[in-house]
């Protein structure tokens, strides 16, 4: 079998994605990979194939009286329910309140900060290490002073290896490669140490990893 390179259009921009289609040399059949479907597929086929998985983002900041959330992103028919759309929408919501200090590199303004990068790492790791074959929820909760990321499945590496970094054993390597192609999760095995380092630099409470 061969994985083909696919060009995906997102908001008028072309994004190169690998592992989206597969070609079987023996049968000469071509089709969408399971990872490609989950990442870039249409909402209904994604829900049909992955009826065991839900995606849910809940913002519990700035709550009004008797409100359970101030913002929520879930399956409501207003967006294509694939991982790529979920990732891009959630990362925008998670970081919209973060400060972006004015910084120039040459003549170009740099809006990214270590905190933005750490939050992207957390979301990326939640997705690539999720067990998409069991019943569960890819869930992110935003509170006034914390973020909570949860996914189905158990850790594939010992806790000590994750804390130390340098090793990666993604449960979804094809999805990991797709995210890396669009600029997320570049450094193998560095995600959690990056988060710890950033939170420590901010003198914030140490993040907790629970299996």
Regions found by a protein language model. Name each.
Residues 1-134, 142, 153-170, 191, ...:
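Active-site helix-to-loop segments that bind/position phosphate- or nucleotide-bearing substrates
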Residues 139-140, 188, 208-211:
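Short beta-strand
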Residues 147-152:
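Conserved DxG motif in ATP/Mg2+-binding regions
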Residues 168-203:
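Glycine-rich phosphate-binding loop
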